[in-house]
Each structure stands twice: as structure tokens, then as C-alpha cells.
């Protein structure tokens, strides 16, 4: 078998782009909480001392946007100018208009209803935009996620945990992780390299304090957790690089501007699967960029959980204002246990991929999105993450004749 290295990265909740994602989704949640039919497209730009929120919203709800922005920044941990940003004193600028009526007419009354006269209630809502979305699953981890992004997210989450609980009190909110795994064919066999970069206080020695603390309190506990989860991976002699550029005192929005939607590979599968290009945060579920990508994860995960394939990638495509998808494609990378066309037919039979049906089946009109905005939208089996359920396994197996 051919050996290869594959790398994925993650970032902490204090990374500037992730701050922007979390702000956008916090605003979305506030609007959905009061008006579940809210149409929301909110973008956030954050830079030194300033947050700018812009977008289009149609809603009956009221949200104190400036206060929501400040509260989220403080919750993340930026509460002092010494850390490069202070949510209590930063400027907040808001420029929000209403959704274009040209877009609204296609979402409110789909092509099937408007032109073809279809009376099906689920055909009344059209896709909020054209586009293509991918979902992916693989059996290399218990959550059916690729191992490199799975471990990278676990490391970045723990990096924030040890900062917040005081285990490593001199850490600051901004941070990144990166994991390189060696594969033998399609099987993950060895951990090659871990990179951890974390913002820190000014009086810290990297070699005698930061690097040993990161190894002891961040990396090693997560490697043990892999074993506890039944993941067999050779970790002896892996390379650990901690802050390889040197000191990392200036971080967060002072170090780099942040923008909603700039971490779409981190949000999904770490580069292991294809991506249609649409970001998630700040968008209500009428936007298929988000809801259909969640549905495709649901589909792919159920295919793998059903034992129909070891790896599965599913693509769906929509035309703006039309309810039915214009395309569905399934790739199993030679791992299918039944004929590939049977899997595609089973998906079309078992899953209704019209936007209104996705919203109904995954219960997406709830204020659940702020918790998706850091550490990955997929692979975290939280109660609100309905797209992580494997509730269509039996139906898929029946549909293919197993």
C-alpha cells in the first residue's frame, strides 16, 4: 500500500475569524429565538478596537446587536487591552438592511408552486440560492470524521479549556492547532506532527514553560483519549512544534483582522472532502449553503453507519427558488459494500432533500447555531446537532435490500 501524509488544522474560539463567526451566529440565534421564521444573512468584520456587523435581515424580532457583540467577545476571553482587545470598550458599528424582495419571492414561493402549480406544502419553499454542497463520513473515528480534523479540533478545544480553567493561566484566547497523520492506503497508522500555536502573556519562557505545559496538559491527554475511543494510532516519536515562530504575544483582532466565513475547511472536514464554497455562520436555514451541507453530513454519516460503505461523500446542488435539488452525486472511493447506484437510489428514497423538508427533519429553526461556530460543525454529537444522528440506518439498509 502507498504511504502518504495528510494534514488538517483547527483554531480556537479566540481566533479572529472564529470570533467573527461566533458573533454572526449569536445574532442569528437571538433573532430565531424570538422569530423562528427570521431570514438572516449577517457578516462580521473585527479588527483592532472595532467590530463591524453588516448584512440583510427580515424578522419580527428585536436583537440588541451591540450588546450581543460585546457579551460574546467577553465570553470568549477578550476582556482587557493587555490581551489585544476588550469587549467592554470596543467600538461596534451595525449596518443591516432587509432581504432583497427578488430573493424572498423565490424562497417564499418556489418554482414548483409558482410555475408548475404544485400544491405540496414542502414545494412551497425554494432554495435561497443556487449552489453545491458536500457531506462526508468515514469509519476511521467513532464519530465518523476524518482523524486529522478530529484530533485537531480536540486539541484546539482543550487549548481553550486549559486557559479557561486556569490549568495554564498565562495563555490568551488566540490559538491554532495542526495535525499531520501518516496513512497506509486509506488507513491512518501514525501520528507524524502536531503543531500548537497559542497566544500567551509577555513574561513566559517558551522552552522551559510553554512547550512542556502544552505537551503535558494539551497534547498527551488527547492522545490518551484517542486510545480510550478505540482509535489505534502509532504515536511514539511524533514531532511536537509549539509556537514555531517564537513569541506569540500580539494576537486576536490586534494581530489579524477577522471575518465571517474564512474558516470553511476547518468548519467541515479539514480538507479530506470537497467543499462547495459556501460558508455557514450568520445564515438562517433557508440558505442551503448551511442547511443542505448539514443534510449532506447526515446522509453520508448514515450511509457509513449503515455499513453501505467505509467512506462516503455526497454532493447535492440547487437552483435558486427551486425546491427539488437539480443534482445528487455519491462517491464511495471504492469502499461500497453494494452497487453504487443502489446507494444513490436509496438516498433519494430515504431522504427528502427539499429545503423545507431538511428544515423540518433536522429541526433547524431553533437558536442552536452559536455552538456550531467553533471547533467544527460536524463530528460533535451534541443533542442539538441533529445532523449527527444515525436515525436512517435501517431505512437505508432496507432500501438497498440488506
Swiss-Prot record:
Subcellular localization: Cytoplasm
What family classification does the UniProt entry report for this protein?
Belongs to the AdoMet synthase family.
Task: Write down what this protein is called.
Answer: S-adenosylmethionine synthase
Among CDD domains, the record links this protein to: S-AdoMet_synt
Q: What's the source species for this entry?
A: Streptomyces avermitilis (strain ATCC 31267 / DSM 46492 / JCM 5070 / NBRC 14893 / NCIMB 12804 / NRRL 8165 / MA-4680)
Region annotation (Flexible loop) maps to 99-109
Residues bound to Mg(2+) are 17
Pathway given in the UniProt record = Amino-acid biosynthesis; S-adenosyl-L-methionine biosynthesis; S-adenosyl-L-methionine from L-methionine: step 1/1
Residues given in the record as ATP binding sites: 15, 174-176, 247-248, 256, 262-263, 279, 283
Q: Name one GO cellular component term.
A: cytoplasm
Q: Which residues bind L-methionine?
A: 56, 99, 256, 287
Q: What does this protein do?
A: Catalyzes the formation of S-adenosylmethionine (AdoMet) from methionine and ATP. The overall synthetic reaction is composed of two sequential steps, AdoMet formation and the subsequent tripolyphosphate hydrolysis which occurs prior to release of AdoMet from the enzyme.
Which Gene3D superfamilies does this one have? 3.30.300.10
Q: Which InterPro entries match?
A: ADOMET_SYNTHASE_CS, S-AdoMet_synt_C, S-AdoMet_synt_central, S-AdoMet_synt_N, S-AdoMet_synthetase, S-AdoMet_synthetase_sfam
Instruction: Using the UniProt record, name the top-level EC class of this enzyme in a single word.
Output: transferase
Record field: catalytic activity: L-methionine + ATP + H2O = S-adenosyl-L-methionine + phosphate + diphosphate
Q: By which gene is this protein encoded?
A: metK
Q: Where does K(+) bind?
A: 43
* GO BP, one annotated term: one-carbon metabolic process
Q: Name the NCBIfam families on file.
A: metK
HAMAP family of this UniProt entry?
A: S_AdoMet_synth1 (MF_00086)
Keyword terms, alphabetized: ATP-binding, Cytoplasm, Magnesium, Metal-binding, Nucleotide-binding, One-carbon metabolism, Potassium, Transferase
Q: Which Pfam families match?
A: S-AdoMet_synt_C, S-AdoMet_synt_M, S-AdoMet_synt_N
Cofactor note (record): Binds 2 divalent ions per subunit.
Amino acid at each position: 500500500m502507498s504511504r502518504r501524509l495528510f494534514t488538517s488544522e483547527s483554531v480556537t474560539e479566540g481566533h479572529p475569524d472564529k470570533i467573527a463567526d461566533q458573533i454572526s451566529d449569536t445574532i442569528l440565534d437571538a433573532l430565531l429565538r424570538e422569530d423562528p421564521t427570521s431570514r438572516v444573512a449577517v457578516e462580521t468584520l473585527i479588527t483592532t478596537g472595532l467590530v463591524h456587523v453588516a448584512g440583510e435581515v427580515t424578522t419580527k424580532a428585536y436583537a440588541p446587536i451591540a450588546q450581543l457583540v460585546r457579551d460574546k467577545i467577553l465570553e470568549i476571553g477578550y476582556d482587557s487591552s493587555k490581551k489585544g482587545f476588550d469587549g467592554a470598550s470596543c467600538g461596534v458599528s451595525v449596518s443591516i438592511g432587509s432581504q432583497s424582495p427578488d430573493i424572498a419571492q423565490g424562497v417564499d414561493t418556489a418554482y414548483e408552486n409558482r410555475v408548475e402549480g404544485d400544491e405540496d406544502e414542502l414545494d412551497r419553499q425554494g432554495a435561497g440560492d443556487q449552489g453545491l454542497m458536500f457531506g462526508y463520513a468515514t469509519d476511521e473515528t467513532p464519530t465518523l470524521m476524518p482523524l486529522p480534523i478530529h484530533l485537531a479540533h480536540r486539541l484546539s478545544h482543550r487549548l481553550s479549556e486549559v486557559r479557561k480553567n486556569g490549568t495554564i493561566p498565562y495563555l490568551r484566547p488566540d490559538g491554532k492547532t495542526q495535525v499531520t497523520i501518516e496513512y497506509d492506503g486509506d488507513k491512518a497508522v501514525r501520528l507524524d506532527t502536531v503543531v500548537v500555536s497559542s497566544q500567551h502573556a509577555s513574561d513566559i519562557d517558551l522552552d522551559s514553560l510553554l512547550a512542556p505545559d502544552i505537551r503535558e496538559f494539551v497534547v498527551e491527554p488527547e492522545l490518551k483519549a484517542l486510545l480510550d475511543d478505540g482509535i489505534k494510532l502509532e504515536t511514539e516519536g511524533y514531532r511536537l512544534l509549539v509556537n514555531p515562530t517564537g513569541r506569540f504575544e500580539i494576537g486576536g483582532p490586534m494581530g489579524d483582522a477577522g471575518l465571517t466565513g474564512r474558516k470553511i475547511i476547518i468548519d467541515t472536514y479539514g480538507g479530506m472532502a470537497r467543499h462547495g464554497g459556501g460558508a455557514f455562520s450568520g445564515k438562517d436555514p433557508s440558505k442551503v449553503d448551511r442547511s443542505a451541507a448539514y443534510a449532506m453530513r447526515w446522509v453520508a454519516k448514515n450511509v457509513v453507519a449503515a455499513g453501505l460503505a467505509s467512506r462516503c461523500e455526497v454532493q447535492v446542488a440547487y437552483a435558486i427558488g427551486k425546491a427539488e435539488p437539480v443534482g445528487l452525486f455519491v462517491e464511495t472511493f471504492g469502499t461500497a459494500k453494494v452497487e453504487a447506484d443502489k446507494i444513490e437510489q436509496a438516498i433519494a428514497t430515504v431522504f427528502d432533500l427539499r429545503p423545507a423538508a431538511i428544515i423540518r427533519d433536522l429541526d433547524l429553526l431553533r437558536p442552536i447555531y452559536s455552538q456550531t461556530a467553533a471547533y467544527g460543525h460536524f463530528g460533535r454529537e451534541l443533542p442539538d446537532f441533529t445532523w449527527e444522528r444515525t436515525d436512517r440506518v435501517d431505512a437505508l439498509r432496507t432500501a438497498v435490500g440488506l
